[in-house]
Amino acid sequence: VYKRQYKNRDYDTAATLLDDFRRKFGRSAFIEDAEGMYALCFYYLSPGPSRDQTMTGQALIAINEFMSRYPHSEQIENFKTINTELTQRLHDKAYLNAYTYYKIGRYKSAIVSLKNALKQYPESSHREEIMYLIVDASYRFASNSVAEKQTDRYLAMLDSYLSFKEEFPESKHIKEVDRMAQHARDYLDRNKQEDNNI
């Protein structure tokens, strides 16, 4: 029955039937195929990165369970490829969520979200872009802040800048972040002189 649902691309129903089969017939000769199909159901149900990634998380769990139970399966290379693809989808989703805040000018929220994306997925393929956006959002956030908060925010921006420059010294964004850092330093120098004159 589950094979018919699977072939008809009714992956929700197939996953339910396959899960039932796995629980009832765990010692069956067909269990490896059933568990592979079960994992693939979630893969096929997983949407693109712009949508909710709950199914992607379930797919990764099912695929990793399959790979740990059947490390010598004929399907293992296919599942490794799928695992990489789904992980990339989660990285893309985290990046897109953070970028949305940046795009609409919510720089404080963007900074938090971008840092969380890096913390959650430090190996993300978007790492350079995320770190650049942290610098840029921090710069914009500091520039648009009230005077009494600008000093601390420019200092935080310079910390992000130094981290970015250390990790990506050859980035296409280097000239731009250097310009932002120089502006921040100029502001801090002027502000320091004004404080000394008081």
Question: Can you describe what each PLM-predicted range is?
Answer:
Residues K3-I198:
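Acidic, polar-rich low-complexity tracts and alpha-helical solenoid repeat scaffolds
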